[in-house]
Amino acid sequence: MRPLNLVITGFGTYCNRTEINLEQLGSQGLYLITGDTGSGKTTIFDAITYALYGDVNGENRTVSMIRSTFATPDIPTEVELSFDYRGKTYLVKRNPEYERRALRGNSTTKQLADAILTMPDGSVITGSEKVTSAI
């Protein structure tokens, strides 16, 4: 499996939509992610793990902790990862359960966790458990 593109929104230290084009790193298969403490290195790996498996790495972090503390109710929490597996491209999108702005009024409502996996042939698998099983 080779990650191609990662889009993170409202996730960990990434409040605003952030896109990381992993294809530009080349096809050598070895990447080095560096940065200051607190700059978001671990969050990148958590986002990839969450996109693929619906969970995060580490004993000290849980899915309920991944929403950015900087995100307002108008900002969604979601991760989108495209990846190559055996020469075919897949796209997975996931969001955890979180509080978002209600469609009517000024209140908030619960956004339920969800996932969508788009297969190379264009077919779509929906639902967190089904997507995790398919991956």
What are these regions (language model features)?
Residues 1-135:
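Extreme N-terminal "head/tail" segments of very large remodeling/mechanoenzyme assemblies
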